[in-house]
Design a protein with these regions (language model features):
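N-terminal export/targeting and maturation segments
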Residues: 31-125
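Extracytoplasmic electrostatic interaction patches
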Residues: 87-220
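Hydrophobic membrane-insertion alpha-helices, especially the h-region
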Residues: 19-37
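Positively charged n-region of N-terminal signal peptides that target proteins for export
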Residues: 2, 14-19
Length: 220
């Protein structure tokens, strides 16, 4: 006598659908959380970069500051052909920086491997020479690099060689602590304070968040 084959009941099939549905929903939640974690700003420079990248072609945060000029510059390729890419440039009025600093500028690169923020400013010493601060935040690696070079008035040239820069600073009695204070008064007390005044930041000038900081003069 041939035995009849057992068929799954409708209830078991419905339960299986519910289980598969819950698994699918859970997977979507995990993917969403992972995406949010990856995209979520890890530090104050991330925050500035991402907000600017989202809004720079319209009205965005830096437009709210009174003493800055905001512009977007169209980029060209190596053959000088126009592209659809831009860099955003924020220039501070010298009058907002005090008597010893000039030419503070932020540039945002939104394309390729060099995505990030470049910050430049000049700090004048008592001798009349100027120290150029060159600061770069790399968006992909989450690294902030702080460097300097010297513009020598007598020769009208920039000194970039580290040994020559150190020798120059020693000649005029400028210490690593002085360089830290010059950086602090412009980047922390000006740029980042301004940012926190126009954006509800999770970070602050004294709490950058998760970022690796490489300072050229750290052990000078």
């Amino acid at each position: 006598m041939e035995m009849s084959r057992l068929k799954p009941s409708g209830r078991i099939g419905d339960n299986m659908k519910k289980i598969l549905g819950l698994i699918g929903l859970y997977a979507l939640i995990v993917l969403f959380c992972f995406y949010f974690f990856i995209q979520h700003p890890k530090n104050i420079f991330d925050e500035i970069y991402q907000e600017t990248a989202k809004n720079y072609l319209g009205y965005y945060n830096f437009n709210e500051l009174k003493n800055v000029t905001v512009k977007n510059r169209k980029l060209y390729d190596s053959n000088m052909n126009e592209t659809d890419k831009y860099e955003s440039i924020i220039t501070y009025d010298d009058s907002s920086l005090g008597s010893d600093a000039k030419n503070l500028e932020l540039r945002f690169n939104f394309d390729g491997s060099s995505k990030g923020i470049n910050i430049w400013f000049e700090r004048y010493t008592n001798s009349g020479e100027k120290i150029n601060f060159v600061i770069h935040y790399g968006f992909k690696k989450k690294v902030l690099v702080k460097k300097i070079m010297i513009y020598e008035n007598s020769s009208k040239t920039y000194i970039e060689d580290e040994a020559q820069v150190k020798s120059y600073l020693e000649k005029y009695g400028i210490t690593a602590k002085d360089l830290d204070s010059y950086y602090d008064e412009i980047v922390n007390q000006k740029v980042l304070k301004d940012w926190c005044s126009i954006f509800d930041s999770k970070y602050s000038p004294s709490n950058y968040g998760e970022v690796k900081v490489e300072t050229q003069w750290e052990n000078w």
